[in-house]
């Protein structure tokens, strides 16, 4: 039986489950016309076509065929002697980003990428209606080493706990706010836009930058200039097209400058505020946390020594390279 077990020495959760069966080679189940090969769709944007579970879609959401987390499970929190266990209730979804099998975030038109960003918002809003879901990760991996090219998709993972990375970020943001009564990320924005040496792109609503202590060469953040803790509350008719144009420009710059490298996109947004367990949980989160997007370029090349990241390229040089590779605006 699948279950989540907590390591009390590190405060981390581990998912224990049998190894998934390898996918059979053959027809791509995510291309138009093969909708019968996937579980029934959860959501879709369609311009035409016969309706649900048929062709004509522009963006489509389906459950993973062998999901890590299932919404049908009963949430059970149990003590096993001194240890803690939780059933992996949640959701494991794939957002099929384009009908085209060979599309990438660099090759698709900004309008198509904008539709993907709207679907990110829709899935976060829908899943956060479930108070047993505590945190949701929206991620996108491109060109994972050892994995053949496949239909473009993002992954949505909803879980009954808070992800370790989210928990660390929330703690740092809260402690900074408690000490200074200011948002950590708003201060980063003021510092970086004033200095400019690590800024790659600056628009009315967003800043693209290489962070001061980048863990990887060309690690890039996209931060909204207007404070807000949740991605889904910030995406609107003005923000979505601007963010799509920026991300399109970033991925094309990476392709032009590095020859289509691997990367991982992560949407960092507040956990599900409906799932508060204790009275004081996230009491200041709307003031202290700031949603953003992180792009980790070639994450498989991360170099660490005892948990300390070692970057062989300074963030200032990395930002300069990205500025040079960015396609001039028409």
What are these regions (language model features)?
Residues 236-246:
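Gly/Ser/Thr-rich active-site loops/lids in small-molecule metabolic enzymes
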